[in-house]
């Protein structure tokens, strides 16, 4: 598959299908997501992603600015992968996140909540949150910045909803955040 031009930092205007697997790989987000497997279960690595996997590096495929302009949600996915895997974000990738993090405000709040919930739930949560702070991404999360700073220094496990509650109690929360009735009653 190959994608046409992205207009909204999320979805391509057109999608065309190709039999060339390299076209498919080159449109993916991070090198660690570029592996293929053939019918004999042999792993195919066309982008030397094994090196990033072994070195625990999150790196965009090709130009990070282009990848994040195509889909701003990819920036939040980078933090989720840090939280889950304990990997480091490659310097150019992190620099692009820092420069483009304001576009996170254009992502549907429900998608943002899903990615943040997964980030809050990860074993390496604090490492991911520190990357959010370093890249100033936390400043673009509708009032969660102070809570994220606080949580990044906690040495206790929190459920995602508890992390949101901490952020809401500490921060100046925007009314964009949407929770279920059950979650609102807890909050």
Whereabouts are the PLM-identified features?
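Catalytic cores of the polymerase beta-like nucleotidyltransferase superfamily
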Residues: 1-187
